[in-house]
């Protein structure tokens, strides 16, 4: 099977690690991960299916997903300045400028250019601070699954 992209827009938090962990917990509790739901539809919306967690913990869900991964943000354990497996790292200013024409992209700019996700390695994730009227308004997390 091929890798699957995933992405999320969430409310801005200055603590990126806390934002990631909150997002992981939200998606786990909603049951929006493989194998609870083998193939998710993005973007996640308020009316997206949420069957509830099918595992006791995120760790158990990751173990059960095995080499396929959860095909979701659950596969991303932490935030780092540098790309790596299981890590969310910031998209560089150069890439922000190249993909969106701005170092402070809006949610709309990112939403229109999701094809940039194809440049992300399997098992990796990036995050972007999105802006509205020059102020941080949200966070974008996007990556590619392992399988």
Task: Specify the residue positions occupied by each region the protein language model found.
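Acidic, proline/glycine-rich low-complexity IDRs
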Residues: 106-147
């Amino acid at each position: 099977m091929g890798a699957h992209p995933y992405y999320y827009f969430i409310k801005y938090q200055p603590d990126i690690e806390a934002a990631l962990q909150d997002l992981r917990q939200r998606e786990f509790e909603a049951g929006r991960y493989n194998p609870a739901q083998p193939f998710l539809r993005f973007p996640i919306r308020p009316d997206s299916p949420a069957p509830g967690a099918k595992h006791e913990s995120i760790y158990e869900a990751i173990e059960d997903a095995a080499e396929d991964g959860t095909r979701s943000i659950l596969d991303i354990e932490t935030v780092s300045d540098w790309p790596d497996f299981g890590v969310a790292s910031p998209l560089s200013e150069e890439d922000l400028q190249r993909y969106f024409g701005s170092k402070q992209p809006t949610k709309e700019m990112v939403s229109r250019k999701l094809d940039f996700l194809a440049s992300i390695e399997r098992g990796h994730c990036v995050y972007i601070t999105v802006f509205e009227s020059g102020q941080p308004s949200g966070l974008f997390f996007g990556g590619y699954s392992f399988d």
